Amino acid sequence: MNEKLKEKVKESLSSVLPITLIVLVLSVTLVPMEIGTLALFLTGAVLLIVGMGFFQLGAEMSMTPLGEGVGKTLAKREKVLLIVLVAFALGTIITIAEPDLQVLANQVASIPNSVLIWTVAVGVGVFLALAVLRILFRVSLAKCLLGAYALLFVLTLFSPKEFLAVAFDAGGVTTGPITVPFIMALGVGVSAIRSTQGHDDDSFGLVALCSVGPILMVLLLGIFYHPTDAAYSAVEIAPVITTRDVAQQFALGFPGYAEEVLLSILPIAAVCVLFQLLTRYYRRRQLLRTGVGFLYTVIGLILFLTGVNVGFTPVGNLLGSGLAGSAYRWVLIPIGALIGYYIVKAEPAVQVLNKQVEDVTGGTVSQSMMNTALSIGVACAVMLSMVRVLTGISIYWILVPGYALALILARYVPSVFVGIAFDSGGVASGPMTSTFLLPLAMGACTALGGNVVTDAFGVVALVALAPPVAIQIMGVLYVHKSKAVAQNKADLLSDDGVIDLEDEEI
């Protein structure tokens, strides 16, 4: 167990370290910071690393077995209505505990946290149920995505522009480190039982469809809900002078975040207990392992949220405002690209997906191939986000052609690539995006006097758009390469046949 925890902490370190080093360099060059502020950031980074380590291990021990167990059990039932209701309930409950969603909700001033969280959670629940039905009835994923995104862009014509970027951001943050292991395991469980051939293709696409639900629900919220007049206010960093002041800031925030986490995790734990009582699916040892996993998840989430809200997010905001307020404001673009490149390389949820992709495709799509494609795509996405912050370009002019290209590419690649690509979009926009890149954009937008809701929000959405395009381009190249290899083999066989005939004549 200790070795696994060390491994998870190392993964978290590789995720947080690049950002930490970039901030340290900027703090002594373009954006000087007070020592106390830097101490808050570094302490927050440590809590983030340890918290994500505990959290990933806990999710692996609890969420993944729960998802796979529920998936296999449901798939054996013949009652479709029961399957739909259980998938909806579980999708909703699991999403409420997603830390990325809580981070986003704290930054949307005009919508109460509970309203936004429940709206998004219901969206995930509805589309998880639809995604399970897709597997059961073997409906094409590409057709489902085409219909879903067509509906989304019709709704954008009626929803207020203030909700557009927030809606697509919500779609990106909900599929994070707590929901991805559960949703993918649920898909594997259902497809393994219900499909006889090609179930590996079926197991992908759940994350992609679950990312659509929150976007749809928030756009509907914009049409029917009248938000408050609360305006975004810049995050203020508490004045800290001594190390005691630093410790005090984290100690003050700890109880509130502990309460949030416990309230979020308890329903999931209750579902696990109820599932065990009804099915007796787990043996005693598995049950103990799952219980320890929930404990690790709680510890990790508390450390994660405390580190993010007290030390990490405020410094991202400060850095953005400092860069935008300087004479070198355009440096935001290359710095954003650099951060985007390294963020996705070690995003926890991405690593979960990459490993499962490599296993399912038998190594055809390796982890290194996935990482390279995602890193380049996300770097370009963050560059566009920073251009939006500096110029005020509407996100609509990027999202529409971007998703149109992704859906067109889906016609020319194998179905497994479609599922992988759109799943990657949901998981690439993970903790580091919502906790650092979004505050960075918000700080820069505030310093420039822009509209935070329309210009800064949307970073997560563009990061989520990059993988569907990048990976499907990789899929097109893979198809052409496979055809070339097949043709070469055919030519060789043909040549061998001619030689054999000549030998026979001699």
Regions found by a protein language model. Give the residues of each.
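Structural signature of hydrophobic alpha-helical transmembrane segments
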Residues: 41-53, 110-122, 170-183, 235-236, ...
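Helix-loop-helix junctions within the multi-pass membrane cores of secondary transporters/permeases
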Residues: 80-151, 329-410
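Small-residue-rich segments of transmembrane alpha-helices in multi-pass membrane proteins
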Residues: 19-23, 51, 79-87, 147-158, ...
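Hydrophobic alpha-helical transmembrane segments in multi-pass integral membrane proteins
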Residues: 158-166, 218-226, 304-311, 383-384, ...
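Transmembrane helix-loop boundary segments of multi-pass membrane transporters
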Residues: 39-40, 58, 105-117, 134-150, ...
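Flexible loop linkers connecting adjacent transmembrane helices
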Residues: 60-78, 103-109, 312-324, 349-365, ...
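Signature of multi-pass transmembrane helix bundles
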Residues: 1-57, 72-73, 171, 184, ...
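Alpha-helical transmembrane segments
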Residues: 128, 132-138, 163, 188-202, ...
